[in-house]
C-alpha cells in the first residue's frame, strides 16, 4: 500500500508570503475584521513547525492505519512481520509512525515491524538526475502552465481583491497561494 503523508502545515515560504499579503492588505485598506481573521489563521502556523505534519494529519494517518488494520486483519497473524517504508522527510516519518500505531490498533495487537527510509523510491524528484534535468529544470516543460497562469493570474488577484473589498492588490503569484489558503480558512 502506498499512502501520501498526512495533512501538513504550510511551508516557510508560504507563511512568509502570508505575512507579506497581510501587510499588503492593511496597506490597501482591507477590512480590519478580515485582516484580523486572516492574521489569526496565519498565527496558528509558527515558522518552527513549517511543513511538519499537522495534528489533523497525524489523526488522519492513525485513522487510515486503523481502518487498514481492521480491513486486513484476516490476512495477518501475530507471527507476521511488516515493513513500513517512508522518505526521510520529517512529516513522512511522523505519518508512518501514526499509521503504524493505528494499524496495530486495527489489528488488535502490536504488529512486528521493521522500517526503511527510501528516498530513491519516494522522493525521486529530488534525486533522480534525469528528472531534475528533463523536467524540474526544463522551462519548456511548463510552457502551457506558464501561458495559462500568465493569462489567469491577474483575474484571480482581482477576484481576491474584490472579495476583500479593496480596489487592488499587489501580489506575486507565489504570494497568492498563501492568500488562497488563508481566504479559504476565514471567509
Predicted regions and their residues:
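Signature for phosphate-centric chemistry
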Residues: 1-83, 87-187
Amino acid at each position: 500500500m502506498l499512502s501520501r503523508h498526512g495533512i501538513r502545515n504550510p511551508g516557510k515560504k508560504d507563511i512568509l508570503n502570508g505575512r507579506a499579503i497581510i501587510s499588503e492588505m492593511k496597506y490597501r485598506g482591507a477590512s480590519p475584521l478580515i485582516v484580523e481573521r486572516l492574521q489569526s489563521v496565519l498565527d496558528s502556523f509558527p515558522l518552527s513547525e513549517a511543513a511538519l505534519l499537522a495534528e489533523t494529519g497525524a489523526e488522519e494517518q492513525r485513522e487510515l492505519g486503523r481502518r487498514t488494520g481492521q480491513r486486513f486483519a484476516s490476512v495477518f497473524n501475530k507471527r507476521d512481520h511488516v515493513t513500513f517504508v517512508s522518505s526521510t522527510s520529517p512529516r513522512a516519518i511522523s505519518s508512518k509512525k501514526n499509521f503504524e500505531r493505528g494499524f496495530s490498533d486495527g489489528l488488535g495487537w502490536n504488529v512486528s515491524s521493521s522500517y526503511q527510509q527510501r528516498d530513491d523510491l519516494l522522493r525521486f524528484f529530488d534525486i533522480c538526475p534525469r528528472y531534475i534535468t528533463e523536467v524540474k529544470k526544463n522551462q519548456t516543460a511548463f510552457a502551457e502552465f506558464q501561458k495559462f497562469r500568465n493569462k489567469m493570474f491577474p483575474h484571480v488577484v482581482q477576484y481576491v481583491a474584490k472579495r476583500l473589498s479593496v480596489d487592488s492588490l499587489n501580489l506575486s503569484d507565489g504570494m497568492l497561494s498563501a492568500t488562497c489558503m488563508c481566504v479559504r480558512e476565514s471567509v
